[in-house]
């Protein structure tokens, strides 16, 4: 879903329970994605540059901390200034240093990150500190015109 948002794509995810994704879907709609929910699928379409927003991770049914890096990538490409507040885990922002190597403009203070959206990323060699960060950096790589290598 976030790959579609980052690349201005059109993706349908099958075999999901859309109700379980309410917080994630709500944020995708908030930033400007078109989202269609089906019985066991979700379609995400992003045609234009997306908008900034505020995200705060919370226990289910709130916004999932596991999806925080993925929306961070999308917000780094969105128009305007976004804020992510991580209220579940410490040190969940390690991927942002790597995203900055690709051209993202980010300031981290404690458990909050302020992200100023840029038009596009530049390809770079980046290192994923964990699985979630690796997924996010792969999405960032899809959104570049250059070559991105994720170690």
Cite the ranges covered by each PLM segment.
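Short, structured segments at the rim of ligand-binding sites
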Residues: 1-151
